[in-house]
Amino acid sequence: MTCRPIWPIVLALVTGTMQAAPSGRLPIPGIQGDDDRTLEQRTTYPWGSIGRLNNTLGPFCTGTLIGPRRVLTAAHCLWNRRTLDWIPPCALHFLAGYRRGSYLAHSLVASYQLGGGQAARRSGPNPNQDWAVLTLADDLGHAVSPLPTLPLDSSLLSGYRETGTFVQAGYSRDRPHMLTRNPRCDILGFSNDDRLAQHACDATFGDSGSPILLRQGDAYHIVAIHIGIDNRTGRGVALTGKAFHGWLEQLEEADPGGETIKACRRRSALPWPSA
């Protein structure tokens, strides 16, 4: 299935100061019909691999451990819209398996690379390359199992549907201190050479960078990451594995180059969000 180009997108990061919206009030952007999200109480595989990406400058997003010291997230989570520059790594903290003030493992971010080698320091992220790989200061592999990635495009979709199901999980604005899981998730169509997809997963602000997982039996693979909401349809927008899987494979073998952000003005203390 092919859909028209998905743009403009409401980028789905959220400031850490925002509170849960009272029930019965305004609808939550990105929640499509009934709210299918459920609170995930477990921190076992694969849920413990997903974590909250805190930012001492304000916004938080979601990320997933893909290697002992590597986290996959959305690039726009690292863009400071006030200063029109990339956020210094020392302002970022990854908390794997975060749950109401506790977590399985934590690390500061030492550096990060912008997806696809994009090097535009002051232009902000391109939606077709809206992913980034964080290099953590600490190895978290002893506490959390990294999740692998797989490509996703229109030629693979039907086969994936036959052999598995799609699940999205992330930290939403209205439930910022618990991982929510959406088991009723599906890919609806593609655009931009299959690098972007519309999806039917309930995901809202704060879920940026959260994985859309393909579950096949007991195995989970990241096939896309949530990056925003289509203004026209209200559907979720994801960056597919076609955009990042091959690049990540190169990263495992050797540094593929691109823009590595290392500059840091200060090291900050761990932000303790209120439960």
Predicted feature descriptions by range:
Residues 1-7:
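Bacterial N-terminal signal peptides that target proteins for export
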Residues 8-16:
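Bacterial N-terminal signal peptides
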Residues 22-45, 59, 85-142:
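Conserved catalytic-core segment of clan PA serine endopeptidases
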Residues 74-77, 223-232:
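Short beta->alpha transition motifs characteristic of CBS
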